């Protein structure tokens, strides 16, 4: 990695000479930043220790003469089965402004096992001034044996930082690692400067349209209007009210690798940066769709951020984080709801496919079309008065399907501000109904591997989906959908016990498999690994060496792109191996006389025979890894991204998405289903292809009940809409008592999510459903109570607009229904540590009910207590209730 950072922000290439005036100017450092870390060279000692460094768990040794240039350093040495080692230093900052940090450090290694990961790294945790954390920002060192190498990265906080802890960390590997010359540098931002997509910005130019260009007006029938001259937006109106601000607007672009300013496109070109743009605007009845393509005209690799910006002064408006949370817009910072990656201009990507801002008069949303994924961010910037979508594109001639270019599609629309983010979400469903089609008519719980026929009284447990197809005939008889198991993006390589756990030894085992040492199936997987294995920036295959309960060896990360080319020496890619397994499983379970298949949009698993679909395990496994393997670029279907040094690469989740789309098309054409595990962790766009979604969880961490947060559960529900989402609890079931099982069941009930159980080690070692302890018998009464309620809710269907509220905001409210007879369900949850009471009221007219409504509390089994125009409710901590409102 490069030794220096030429601008405030990144490891830059030569700056492109720009002739036109930029729309927004980037501030470049006139002086070095402030060094915050004390004694980063470990030379100063107090009582034999390098002050003010502290030990991380098992700590470190101080070693005079072994540092860089013969100086003093720290060393961590770890053997198999030992704990974690490292040196840590916490900086109390109490900042009131936002500034970037540059994290640097050096390390050398001797016989370090495994592959690069955050277990051997510079590892930084921060706590923001508002108390929220940002954990695990890392730069990883190479494993094996190597001389001193430097790692550095830019940490871009979203908010002012209260404290920062820097670790020289060594865990999860064996061997010996030395650390030296660590530093944390804070880059000053001049007065009035703001952070804009990871770059410090000062001097935002007032938008000056080309008055020679003709006016172009784009209007919807519901009152949204854009007026443009060439690329500049001169008017933004909602309901006839002007909302536009004199801010840079339209399509803007910044060359990340060249550390350029931000420029606008003129007549479809940005000559200053050597880029062209084709953009088409499609005004519809209730939205404006915008699609196009940006192309490099310089004939070399590029790392570029493309933005489409609406000029909007939304000071005093609300920014919606999700259906439950919003923030008042003010100050000069960016408002965004993102997940962290290691690529792109600021290492961020939006969590939701839509962003919504509103006040009492107007609501405005920007949204990605999930059929056109990319690394994108939806942002409101209070300092620049811009509401925009930003794309990070890596451009290279090697992407044969779109050489040196990247395509995009997004929409702009208005929504009813009275319901904020929920109304924006409902409108998104209306705009993209095909992305939320529910093909499962009969929902139920998720059974992993165990033959359901072997569970006495299985009907009590509400099974709907069988992972692993252990007894397809039985599942067919009882309306349970069965799925063939595949894991798209990996090869788990079992290694002989006497083989050292190193990269080279793993490749040796793999090549022996290729030669047939362990049979035909192992040979095919070896070929697929050598064909589809993704590579890091040094050209090495991604390999994580580990001893998992199901595999002692290592796991290679593979691209499941079906179009990756094979060779006579390596005649398989990963997709081919999986397609072969899928075809064999369907043939093996083919009924002698198949009944007619329903239309895909109304498929009922009860009406099918044989396998009902494909199960993709670990969908977001390795999702954030970056693939630098150039021959894989040739078959890319999604725009490339770029790394911290501006090098184009593939984000792994896009390759998995491509395979997912391929399998989904095959299954849906046959009236079958697609099920995936480990989905809706960080990414939204895989959800539209799926019919059943789920993940494995452990809500009993370190002996304490720690359920997934409301924000996490909200995200799952919103992106599924009315599709089933299922959980599998992997925990110590002896300690996960019936009281906790009930809390788990009630929390799932509130969101319409199916609770399930698997195995403490997620490895079928002593699974819940097959254990001699028969945990399901202990919990059977709870299943019998909650499964019928859950089935009724999910059949009625979740709705984003509740048309109901509680006067105590600590009692959360969701809505399901109406049923065919008009019955509506309001689910209620106390997500606090204290008993909460309040009055629930509903807009009966909006819910299609009359004033003489009957209200029943279904969990407690009693009539709801009337209170004025609503119903009185009191809930214990983590308790849920269902109000059934009927005519």
Question: What are the residue ranges of the model-derived segments?
Answer:
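Extracellular and organelle-lumenal recognition/adhesion modules and their flexible linkers in secreted
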Residues: 22-217, 227-273, 287, 309, ...
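Carbohydrate-recognition beta-sandwich/jelly-roll modules
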Residues: 190, 218-508, 612-613, 771, ...
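Solvent-exposed beta-hairpin/edge-strand motifs
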Residues: 309-324, 843-861
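Active-site-proximal substrate-binding groove within the catalytic cores of carbohydrate-active enzymes
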Residues: 399-408, 477, 652-853, 859
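The substrate-binding groove and active-site-proximal loops of carbohydrate-active enzymes
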Residues: 443-455, 459-467, 548-592, 641-656, ...
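Active-site-adjacent "subsite" loops/lids of carbohydrate-active enzymes
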Residues: 484-596, 604-607
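Active-site neighborhood of glycoside hydrolase catalytic domains
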Residues: 578-596, 606-685
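C-terminal beta-strand-rich structural cap/linker in extracellular carbohydrate-active enzymes
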Residues: 867-887
């Amino acid at each position: 990695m490069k030794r220096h950072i030429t601008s405030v922000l990144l490891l830059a290439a030569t700056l492109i000479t720009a002739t036109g005036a930029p729309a927004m100017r980037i501030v470049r450092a006139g002086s070095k930043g402030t060094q915050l870390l004390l004694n980063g060279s470990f030379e100063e000692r107090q009582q034999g220790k390098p002050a003010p460094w502290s030990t991380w768990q098992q700590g470190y040794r101080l070693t005079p003469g072994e540092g860089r240039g013969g100086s003093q350093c720290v060393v961590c040495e770890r053997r198999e089965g030992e704990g974690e080692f490292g040196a840590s230093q916490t900086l109390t900052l109490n900042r009131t402004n936002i500034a970037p940090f540059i994290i640097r450090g050096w390390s050398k290694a001797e016989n370090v096992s495994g592959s690069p990961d955050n277990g051997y790294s510079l590892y930084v945790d921060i706590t923001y001034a508002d108390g929220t954390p940002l954990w695990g920002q890392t730069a990883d060192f190479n494993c094996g044996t190597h001389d001193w190498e430097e790692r550095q990265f830019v940490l871009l906080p979203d908010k002012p930082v209260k404290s920062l802890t820097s670790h020289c960390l060594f865990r999860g590997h064996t061997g010996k690692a030395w650390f030296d010359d660590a530093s944390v540098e804070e880059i000053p931002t001049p007065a009035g400067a703001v952070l804009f997509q990871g770059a410090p910005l000062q001097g935002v130019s007032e938008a000056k349209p080309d008055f020679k260009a003709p006016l172009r007006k784009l209007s919807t029938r519901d009152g949204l209007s854009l007026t443009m001259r060439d690329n500049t937006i001169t008017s933004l109106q909602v309901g006839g009210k002007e909302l536009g601000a004199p801010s840079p607007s339209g399509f803007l672009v910044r060359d990340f690798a060249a550390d350029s300013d931000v420029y606008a496109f003129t007549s479809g070109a940005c000559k200053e940066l050597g880029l062209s743009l084709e953009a088409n605007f499609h005004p519809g009845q209730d939205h404006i769709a915008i699609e196009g393509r940006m192309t490099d005209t310089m004939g070399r690799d590029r790392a570029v951020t493309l933005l489409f910006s609406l000029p909007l002064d939304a000071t005093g408006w609300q920014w919606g984080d999700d259906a439950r949370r919003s923030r008042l817009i003010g100050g000069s910072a960016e408002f965004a709801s993102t997940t962290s990656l290691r690529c792109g201009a600021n290492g961020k990507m939006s969590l939701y496919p839509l962003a919504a801002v509103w006040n009492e008069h107007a609501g405005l949303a920007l949204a990605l079309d999930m059929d056109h994924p990319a690394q994108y961010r939806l942002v409101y910037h209070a300092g620049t008065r811009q509401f925009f979508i930003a794309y990070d594109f890596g451009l290279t001639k090697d992407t044969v399907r779109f050489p040196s270019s990247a395509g995009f599609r997004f929409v702009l629309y208005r929504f009813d501000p009275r319901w904020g983010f929920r109304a924006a979400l409902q409108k998104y469903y209306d705009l993209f109904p095909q992305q939320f089609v529910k093909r499962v008519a009969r929902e139920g719980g998720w059974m992993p591997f165990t033959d359901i026929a072997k569970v006495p009284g299985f009907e009590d447990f509400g099974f709907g989906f069988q992972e692993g197809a252990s007894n397809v005939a039985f599942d067919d008889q009882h309306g349970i959908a069965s799925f063939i198991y595949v894991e798209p993006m990996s090869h788990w390589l079992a290694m002989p016990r006497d083989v050292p756990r190193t990269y080279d030894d793993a490749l040796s085992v793999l090549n022996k498999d290729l030669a047939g040492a362990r049979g035909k199936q192992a040979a095919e997987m070896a070929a697929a690994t050598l064909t589809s294995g993704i590579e890091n920036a040094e050209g090495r295959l991604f390999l994580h060496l580990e001893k998992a309960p199901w595999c002692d060896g290592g796991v290679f990360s593979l691209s499941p792109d079906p179009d990756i080319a094979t060779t006579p020496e390596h005649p398989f890619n990963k997709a081919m191996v999986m397609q072969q397994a899928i075809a064999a499983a369907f043939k093996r379970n083919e009924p002698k006389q198949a009944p007619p298949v329903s239309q895909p949009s109304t498929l009922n698993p009860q009406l099918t025979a044989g396998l009902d679909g494909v199960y993709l395990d670990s969908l977001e496994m390795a999702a954030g890894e970056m693939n630098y393997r150039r021959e894989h670029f040739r078959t890319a279907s999604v725009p490339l991204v770029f790394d911290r040094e501006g090098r184009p690469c593939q984000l792994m989740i896009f390759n998995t998405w491509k395979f997912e789309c391929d399998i989904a098309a095959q299954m849906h054409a046959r009236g079958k289903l697609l099920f995936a595990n480990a989905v809706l962790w960080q990414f939204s766009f895989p959800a539209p292809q799926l019919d059943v979604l789920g993940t494995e969880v452990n809500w009993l961490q370190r002996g304490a009940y720690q359920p997934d947060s409301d924000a996490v559960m909200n995200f799952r529900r919103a992106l599924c809409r009315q599709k089933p989402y299922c959980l599998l609890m992997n925990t110590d079931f002896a300690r996960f008592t019936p009281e906790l099982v009930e809390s788990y069941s009630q929390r799932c009930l509130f969101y319409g999510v199916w609770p399930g159980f698997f195995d403490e080690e997620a490895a079928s070692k002593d699974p819940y459903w097959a254990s001699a302890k028969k945990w399901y018998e202990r919990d059977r009464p709870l299943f019998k109570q909650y499964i019928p309620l859950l089935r009724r809710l999910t059949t009625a269907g979740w709705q984003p607009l509740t048309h109901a509220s509680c006067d105590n905001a600590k009692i959360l409210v969701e809505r399901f229904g109406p049923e065919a007879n008009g019955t509506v369900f309001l689910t209620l949850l106390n997500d606090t540590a204290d008993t909460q009471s309040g009055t629930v009221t509903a807009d009966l007219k909006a819910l299609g009910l009359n004033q003489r409504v009957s209200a029943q509390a279904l969990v407690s089994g009693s009539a709801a207590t009337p209170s004025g125009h609503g119903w009185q409710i009191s809930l214990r901590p983590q308790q849920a209730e269902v109000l059934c409102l009927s005519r």
